[in-house]
Amino acid sequence: MSATSWFLVSSSGARHRLPRELIFVGREECELMLQSRSVDKQHAVINYDQDRDEHWVKDLGSLNGTFVNDMRIPDQKYVTLKLNDVIRFGYDSNMYVLERVQHRVPEEALKHEKYTSQLQVSVKGLAPKRSEALPEHTPYCEASNPRPEKGDRRPGTEAASYRTPLYGQPSWWGEDDGSTLPDAQRQGEPYPERPKGPVQQDGELHGFRAPAEPQGCSFRREPSYFEIPTKETPQPSQPPEVPAHEMPTKDAEAGGGGAAPVVQSHASFTIEFDDCSPGKMKIKDHITKFSLRQRRPPGKEATPGEMVSAETKVADWLVQNDPSLLHRVGPGDDRHSTKSDLPVHTRTLKGHKHEDGTQSDSEDPLAKAASAAGVPLEASGEQVRLQRQIKRDPQELLHNQQAFVIEFFDEDTPRKKRSQSFTHSPSGDPKADKRRGPTPADRDRPSVPAPVQAGGRSSGPQRAGSLKREKTEERLGSPSPASRTPARPFGSVGRRSRLAQDFMAQCLRESSPAARPSPEKVPPVLPAPLTPHGTSPVGPPTPPPAPTDPQLTKARKQEEDDSLSDAGTYTIETEAQDTEVEEARKMIDQVFGVLESPELSRASSATFRPVIRGDRDESDDGGVAQRMALLQEFASRPLGAAPQAEHQGLPVPGSPGGQKWVSRWASLADSYSDPGLTEDGLGRRGGEPEGSLPVRMRRRLPQLPSERADSPAGPESSRRSGPGPPELDSEQPSRLFGQEELDPDSLSDASGSDGGRGPEPGVEPQDSRRRSPQEGPTWSRGRRSPRAPGEPTPASFFIGDQNGDAVLSRKPLAAPGDGEGLGQTAQPSPPARDGVYVSANGRMVIQLRPGRSPEPDGPAPAFLRQESFTKEPASGPPAPGKPPHISSHPLLQDLAATRAARMDFHSQDTHLILKETETALAALEARLLSNSVDAECEGGSTPRPPEDALSGDSDVDTASTVSLRSGKSGPSPTTPQPLRAQKEMSPSPPAAQDPGGTALVSAREQSSERQHHPLGPTDMGRGEPVRRSAIRRGHRPRGSLDWPSEERGPVLAHLPSSDVMASNHETPEATGAGRLGSRRKPAAPPPSPAAREEQSRSSASSQKGPQALTRSNSLSTPRPTRASRLRRARLGDASDTEAADGERGSLGNPEPVGRPAAEQAKKLSRLDILAMPRKRAGSFTGTSDPEAAPARTSFSGRSVELCCASRKPTMAEARAVSRKAANTATTTGPRQPFSRARSGSARYTSNTRRRQQGSDYTSTSEEEYGSRHGSPKHTRSHTSTATQTPRAGSSSRARSRAPGPRDTDDDEEEPDPYGFIVQTAEIAEIARLSQTLVKDVAILAQEIHDVAGDGDTLGSSEPAHSASLSNMPSTPASTISAREELVQRIPEASLNFQKVPPGSLNSRDFDQNMNDSCEDALANKTRPRNREEVIFDNLMLNPVSQLSQAIRENTEHLAEKMKILFQNTGRAWEDLEARINAENEVPILKTSNKEISSILKELRRVQKQLEVINAIVDPSGSLDLLTGNRSLASSAQPGLGKGRVAAQSPPSPASAEALLPALPLRNFPQRASCGPPSLPDPTFLPDAERFLI
């Protein structure tokens, strides 16, 4: 039988068989891959004419052209290639000569598997065998006689294999040359193509090429390229091999060639997994991007073929059934390129002996190394392939979930890095791992016989489990570092690419919709199954497995990391065994809010990650039973022993799939792990890994019962909170199962939203109450209630003490003090001071300052969220009265002078995450405070929590911890707190203590994730997966479970308590403004989410009760906030609700009023700063007008609003409409009250009221969210208003605009700028924030301007009422929905808006100076033209325009000089200028008067410049403090900065927080609010000052 094979023989001698089909030639993803840069990605096409048996080449319009015989062929036109034509693609160094090999395929060859592979599906199996078994290959190719034929084929194939220019096909083409190779060999034997080595060429090349083809098909299942060709070459199947490899039927199918055309070779893009030569393991068609790695044992010749053949069959079968198992290309594997450009693959080709970069399998150093590794190359190849495969396709692995633990210890030596996947299958296949892991024998076995497993293949799966366990243990810190080492490979695999992780997370979520909490809950599920298997043994056995081959494991981990990184889809494990690396990663994680401390990362992540995967799956597939069994076992386990078992057992499930894997998508899970460890779900998940799996389970199950029993939801809570000790035994199986399904998420989601949340919250509160004295509402303790009070679950909650925050997770049985301190972090008892709250995300750690912790304010300091994000508390506990510093994001850090404490954070890098954290922390804080209060009320241990309960009640203040601390203690007396405590305990207990941590963390994580989503940049690594999962969760109807009707539902879906609170402001959070929103909003939301939880879990009455309680606690306006939020979300009419909501949401308002103005200003100002931009963000949804009005009060709310925009754009829209309606109504009605409240009262009080009112009238608007949700934000807003007199005044006025009477307020506020002196520190803070904001805002302003250039003006008009700054961010959003309002207020809006970006304050000050009507944005409707008139009259357009131009010029000169003076801030200048310019671009007025617009633009520019100057000159705001009065000069800007920075500060924080996180959503508003508020504020203040002057 003769067949014609056409080859392109490169000048280097490499031969590339041309398949009888169209192939692409190019640099990427092409069958013939050339490495020359002159070759386009898709350069040319070579087609085949079956009738004429000739090939055509067509240049695909490549840049450098395609040359045939040195003649450039026309583009897009087929040119027939003749024999011996010289083809050159681009300027590739290789010239290809077209050669035709007429090879007669001997019968033997026809019988050869290569030919057979196409005919028989078993070819695939054969291929691996063959590759592995040279003997097979030899008989296969008849090394002696057929070898010439096959040799010919082989040379081509070989060249194709290692040198295949074709993307993947060259490999399989060359391999298919197995069929054509004989031809090539006969005819082209002379060709150096075969230089690789005759023997290897013969058997190996041939053998594994041919088999690889089928394999490629089967593995890839992508016959698109290769299966089509399979028909071409009927490869005579080699009877012996085919039967053996019937499994690779797919391959045969793919090959499909059957014994028809001999030349089919490429027909089935065969993946050459030559066990002997990994380099050879090329999928001819690159089809095996993952399969490439499958079988390329370096240097493996056919010698071990027989053994390999068996293994290969298995591996091939696995690969066929699990593409994820396909080999990954080894270092020596160069399947992608022809290696035409050697330098590209210098490293890869290092071992290649030939100039062209080709090398025979025998020459593959990696292969040889692998063979030398001591593992049979075949076994090694197979294992490597499996490992690679596992590693390769985490998602596929997830789906395929084949439990392959490939022993790479011995074989890994050469290919360890490439074959680290021994953990892949477990990690890659968490399900498989789970399934496997759940097997007691597996779990236990791996633990005990880990070494054996490491050594033996049979122990592979077990080892995978054990490794997982080890990893978990490592994370937990229970196993020795060595044990951690083995775990890491799994972690790596488990980590999977974020994509895979996200995918898995999503799949898991989808698989267990009911287990929506599953992401967090699932981990427990998985742990349960895993642990049950090794339940008792898991604890003890795990350590042995971890130690197993520690170095090997470590090496593998490193190698695996390498391979994972090479794959690019795998995220590097953070659970590095390397202490330094771990610490560095920990720091990074912490900075990014991931807070994956070694314990968290390892225990939580590892345990957690696979759990999520497996948990969901298991819950789907019956993991529930295992889970229940596991939980029961845990329950039965001794607490002391349980933790280890949990460490090992729980982490094991997650270990393979990964700690990072979960970490990423499950920042949720992680956060839930981190705090959740503390929490009941996390306790199980993260805590278990820490060493209290049983405890964790217990905590989780019974936690809520007693509290829930207390509240209407009590029964359900108890039922759900199986974790609690009381119900642990009885309910643990079912409860734990349910909770594992629901709790993990509920943990992260405050375990309230899904019915499973309720119990968690209830459980946590119950535990908190029980342990209140010791743990208070510490998530760790609360969740671990089953644990001895003193027995901390190390991984429970990464709220480690300052000293042991990271240790906590690691300490399986951390000292009670440590655990407690951590636990009490939530409940700022003395231990709490040291504790840090780690959001369920693991992203935010709320650090309760020990200093605060001492309850200086009693209840007020109870809730120290000084560092929303830091694991370790801030440098020093702030004064009890001082607000805990939430230096979650750089703005805050800068603001506080980065407040030494804040500086403790590693949040600078995690700017956005920190913002999220702020938001989440605010929510968490409020929750924890309320829960702490509840716990105190119930446990009486922590009086502060009751005080904070107020804060918790009005999470607004919680959002602004400061406001929470100082204001809430007073305004929200303990009386409401007990009610709230009960309310929160039952509805938001999850959010309160442990659940609060989890819920808040979950809310935070979700808010952070949602915010993060828009905010992609900061949390890109883990944040993104987290974001995705959070978003998935958010969009999943978890919160919806509680409030399905809510538009907020999607977000709420996953956060019952925290999510409800976060979900209510979830959009803001999602937008990234939600962080503040979360913080600000949670005070009210915790009850609301709690209430919703109650609703979902217990009953409407429960919710009503908490709401009623919240209502009773007028100071903490959680229920109205919640109700308003719900209304807004559901009905979009927050107007009436907001009135109460504004008041309630203005928890901070009374609070701020109660507080010293300066303190309020400072606390609120910083929070305001953070919150205001959030408000703005909210505005982006187009709810700006009403929102803007309260935006001042609730910048954060606004920010939240914008965040909400992502989550509830529709709601935002509805709200925007509602706001318009409400604004019109409220503008007349509430606005006057606002005016009164604000004008008559102290700025704070007025602001508070205005905030309340603003919230009221903006109840429809997202700002209402902010106001309701973020009382602190409102407080902050009003503080901002007070603090940033011009801006705050503007804000006030802006609000006033919403409430017409506010105009008076504007007047009142006008003097306030001087009153800002009191808030000097705050102003300095604001100045710092404004600096940061200026940078961020500059960028954001540009983006916003680009996005909403004109919208800003519109937004401004709406926000104008709410202070251009405050509303500006929200204005753009608001602008969208409130354009009608804008129309009404256009004159003022335009002025305001123009003021907002460049002179939000400036314009305001200017307005105040010229006309208080500048603030009439609120009163815009009342006197929309007044402002214009005032502007016209005051500016006297021409003179004003000239003046503004002169001012602008002078300001620019000054800015230039300042830039020179502050060159180190040049970048900041540029950024600021860019942002400012972008803002200036924003249409200032919707005024027909172009002169006014130009003036406004000029002034805006001036404002921007001044802001830049202010930021540069006085980044710390110290000058602002010195400058009590507004100055025209840049120095005055700091003075103005007080007012301006203060005024600007709220937008600034919002800007940084909302803008950065929600920049995408709020681009326009942010620019308006962020850029202009932060930049324009100083600028505007100076401008305003100038005008005033």
UniProtKB/Swiss-Prot annotation:
Record's protein name: Centrosomal protein of 170 kDa protein B
Upper lineage: Eukaryota, Metazoa, Chordata, Craniata, Vertebrata
Lineage: superkingdom: Eukaryota
Biased composition (Basic residues): 1029-1038
SMART domains per record: FHA
PTM-bearing positions, type Phosphothreonine: 542, 1304
Keywords associated with the record: Cytoplasm, Cytoskeleton, Microtubule, Phosphoprotein
Compositional bias (Low complexity): 478-489, 711-722, 1286-1301, 1542-1552
InterPro entries assigned: Cent_Immune-Sig_Mod, CEP170_C, FHA_dom, SMAD_FHA_dom_sf
The protein's role, per its UniProt record: Plays a role in microtubule organization.
Annotated PANTHER family: CENTROSOMAL PROTEIN OF 170 KDA, CENTROSOMAL PROTEIN OF 170 KDA PROTEIN B
Annotated positions of the Phosphoserine modification: 360, 421, 480, 492, 536, 597, 619, 655, 711, 721, 746, 748, 751, 753, 772, 829, 853, 954, 972, 986, 988, 1135, 1179, 1199, 1356, 1362, 1545, 1548
Record's compositionally biased regions (Basic and acidic residues): 147-156, 243-253, 330-344, 430-446, 467-476
Record's keyword annotation contains Phosphoprotein: yes
Domain FHA positions: 23-73
Region of interest (Disordered), ranges: 130-261, 287-309, 325-388, 409-583, 598-895, 934-1316, 1350-1374, 1532-1552
GO cellular component, one term: microtubule
Intracellular or extracellular location(s): Cytoplasm, Cytoskeleton
